[in-house]
A protein has these predicted regions:
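N-terminal pre-Walker A segment at the start of P-loop NTPase domains
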Residues: 1-21
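Interdomain motor-coupling "hinge/lid" segment immediately C-terminal to the ATP-binding subdomain
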Residues: 2, 121-236
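Accessory nucleic acid-recognition modules appended to NTPase machines
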Residues: 2-5, 190-355
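Hydrophobic anchor at the beta1->P-loop junction of P-loop NTPases
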Residues: 32
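Conserved lysine of the Walker
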Residues: 40-41
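Conserved catalytic/switch belt of AAA+ P-loop NTPases
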Residues: 92-116, 123-125
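Domain-level recognition of nuclease-like catalytic cores that cleave nucleotide substrates
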Residues: 159, 393-413
Length: 413
C-alpha cells in the first residue's frame, strides 16, 4: 500500500499494489511509470524496507555515480529500486546486462515520470526482462481508502443480467463529481488539501516545475510560454478529436511544433490520447484519437475554468478506466467509437473478445434518447457487444431499454 502522510495518517492503499507485488515475483524487472507526484516513489519505497536498496536519480550524487560507474548501482545480490530512471536512461543497458548475468525475479524495481517506451534516445526497452505498469492519479475510491478503482472488473466478469446486483452490493456512495474534478487525483491536492486556494498554489507549482525542470529532461524547450499556451489549449479540448492543424492555428504555432509538444505531454503522462475503435462493418468511422488529460484538477487549473463541464466528467471516468486497465494481467483496450454521421460512444472497453460500450452524460435524469448511440453500437457489432452502460449524475439505477443500463457514475467509479 502507498503510505501517504497527511491530515489522516492511516495508510492509503493503491489499486496497483497487488499487481506490482505479483509481477515482482515473476519478472526480473518491473517498471512503474506515471506522471510526477502520482505516488510512485512512495509506493515503491514501501517495498524497499529491509529488503531492497533504494536509489533516486533526483539525488545529484546518484546521477553522478550512474554516469561514472553504473555497475555500482545495479550490481550485487540485493534487489535494487531505481527511482526516476528517466533522468539517466542509459542505466537501462546496465540493468539489462545485470539481468542477463543472473536472472532473478524481483531483481529490479524501476520508476520513471516519463514513458520510457516513447522517449527519444532510449534504445533499451528491457524486452522480455521487464513488466511495465502505469500509476495514474488516485481514483475516488483510492482517495476514500478503499484501495481500488471502480467496479469494471465486476461488470466485465459478470453476465449482463447480473449487473444490477453487483452495483447494488458494492457502492462507494454518492459524491459531487464537480468537487472531485476540481481536486483531481494527485495525492497532495486530492487528499491533503482542503481549500481551492491551497490547490491552486500546488497546481501552479506543479506546472512550473514541469515546464522548467521535468520537460527539459525529455527535450530542450526554450519557448516555455508557447508550450504552456499549447497545454492550456489542449485543456479546452477534452473529449474532442485531436486536430493538430486546428490546435496550431489556435496557439499560433507551426503544426510540426504542436505535434512535438503533444507527444511530449503524452510521454509525460499529462495528456492521454484515446484511440478509435475502427472495426467497420456497415458504417464509416472516424479514426483520429480523442484527447483527454491525465488529471482533471490540473486541466481545470491550466484552462482557468472554475466550473467543470461534462467533458471533465468523461475524463474522470476515463481516469478510473485507465487505473483498472493498467493493473490487469489480461490485455484490455480503452477506445471510443464515432461514425462519420456523428453517432458516438464515449468509451469502448475491448477485452476477452467482447466490447463494453459506455456513454457518460452529465445529467441527473437520463432519457431514452441518451441511449440511442449505445443501441446503434450494439446493432452494429451484434453478439460481440455487451449491454450498453449509460453513466449519469443522478441516482436512478435501471434498464432504460432491454440492452442499456443507466447507472449513477459513482456506483461504478
Amino acid at each position: 500500500m502507498d503510505i501517504i502522510h497527511g491530515v489522516n495518517t492511516l495508510p492509503l492503499p493503491r489499486h496497483m499494489q497487488p499487481a506490482l507485488t505479483q509481477r515482482l515475483r515473476v519478472m526480473p524487472a518491473v517498471v512503474v511509470t506515471g506522471a510526477r507526484q502520482t505516488g510512485k516513489s512512495t509506493l515503491v519505497q514501501v517495498l524497499t524496507l529491509g529488503e531492497r536498496r533504494f536509489h533516486t536519480l533526483d539525488d545529484l550524487d546518484v546521477v553522478e555515480l550512474a554516469q561514472r560507474d553504473p555497475e555500482a548501482l545495479v550490481g550485487g545480490s540485493t534487489p535494487v529500486t531505481l527511482d526516476e530512471v528517466q533522468r539517466e536512461p542509459d542505466l537501462l543497458l546496465a540493468v539489462k546486462r545485470a539481468i542477463d548475468r543472473r536472472r532473478r525475479a524481483g531483481q529490479f524495481l524501476l520508476t520513471g515520470s516519463a514513458n520510457l517506451l516513447l522517449m527519444r534516445g532510449v534504445s533499451e526497452s528491457l524486452a522480455g526482462r521487464a513488466s511495465y505498469l502505469t500509476l495514474w492519479p488516485m481514483t475516488r475510491r483510492e482517495q476514500r481508502r478503499l484501495g481500488r478503482c471502480g467496479l469494471w472488473e465486476d461488470l466485465i466478469t459478470a453476465e449482463d443480467g447480473e449487473w444490477l446486483d453487483r452495483l447494488r452490493a458494492d457502492s462507494a456512495g454518492p459524491e459531487d463529481w464537480r468537487a472531485l474534478a476540481r481536486r483531481g487525483g494527485f495525492p497532495t491536492p486530492a487528499v491533503h488539501m482542503t481549500t481551492a486556494a491551497e490547490r491552486a498554489v500546488w497546481f501552479e507549482g506543479y506546472a512550473r516545475t514541469y515546464l522548467e525542470r521535468d520537460l527539459q529532461t525529455l527535450s530542450s524547450i526554450a519557448a516555455l510560454p508557447d508550450f504552456r499556451r499549447l497545454m492550456r489549449a489542449a485543456c479546452f479540448r477534452l473529449g474532442q478529436l485531436v486536430n493538430q492543424t486546428e490546435l496550431a492555428r489556435d496557439v499560433a504555432l507551426p503544426q510540426p511544433t504542436v505535434h512535438r509538444y503533444i507527444n511530449l505531454l503524452e510521454t509525460s503522462f499529462l495528456l492521454v490520447r484515446v484511440p478509435a475503435y475502427a472495426v467497420n462493418r456497415t458504417k464509416r468511422l472516424m479514426k483520429s484519437p480523442k484527447l483527454y488529460w491525465g488529471d482533471t484538477g490540473l486541466a481545470l487549473h491550466l484552462s482557468g475554468l472554475t466550473a467543470p463541464t461534462g467533458a471533465h466528467l468523461e475524463n474522470l471516468v476515463l481516469n478510473d478506466l485507465l487505473c483498472w486497465r493498467d493493473a490487469r494481467t489480461e490485455h484490455s483496450e480503452i477506445l471510443y467509437w464515432r461514425t462519420v454521421a456523428g453517432e458516438e460512444v464515449d468509451f469502448v472497453v475491448e477485452t476477452g473478445g467482447r466490447l463494453l460500450p459506455i456513454e457518460v452524460k452529465a445529467t441527473t435524469r437520463p432519457r431514452l434518447r441518451d441511449a440511442a448511440h449505445l443501441r446503434s453500437f450494439r446493432r452494429e457489432y451484434g453478439n460481440a457487444a455487451r449491454a450498453g452502460l449509460l453513466l449519469h449524475t443522478g441516482t436512478a439505477l435501471e434498464w432504460v431499454t432491454p440492452d442499456v443500463l443507466a447507472a449513477p457514475w459513482w456506483m461504478v467509479c
